[in-house]
Amino acid sequence: MPGNIPSEIRGQKYISLTTFRKNGAKIATPVWFGEDGDKLYVMTRSDMGKTKRIRNNSQVRVAPCSIRGKVTGPEYSASARVLPPEEHAHARQAINRKYWMARLPLIWRRTDTYLELSFL
């Protein structure tokens, strides 16, 4: 059902977030994510490749994966957006609820932006 987080993604520890270069090449990255309603939230840095690629092409693919990025389930289409600073607190709370390590100041020191993923 469009807009809902697939059951294969809910409750997973990691997802493989696939973004696309301008030439169409796929780049997959295993990431932590938080869930809230029908959205996923990912923490990252604004100078990371995935953030730059999402600014150019908001279409992404999402699949459950291992810590090393080995995909363990079906892949789903989603749309991603880089959140403005006023929406960071909400994304941070979603991630903090899931990962105790995310609450450590050291983790957030290097994080300066968040992504919101919506399933198509």
Q: What would you call each of these model-derived segments?
A:
Residues 1-15, 72:
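Extreme N-terminal tail/first-helix region
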Residues 4, 17-23, 101-107:
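Short helix-to-loop capping/linker segments positioned immediately adjacent to catalytic or ligand/cofactor-binding
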Residues 5-6, 40-44, 48-53:
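Covalent nucleotidyltransferase core used to form phosphodiester bonds in nucleic acids
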Residues 12-45, 62-64, 74-76:
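Short beta-strand segments
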Residues 19, 118-119:
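Short, structured patches in soluble enzyme cores that scaffold and shape functional sites
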Residues 42, 116-117:
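Generic recognition of long tandem-repeat/solenoid scaffolds
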Residues 47-114, 120:
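Short, structured beta-strand-loop surface elements
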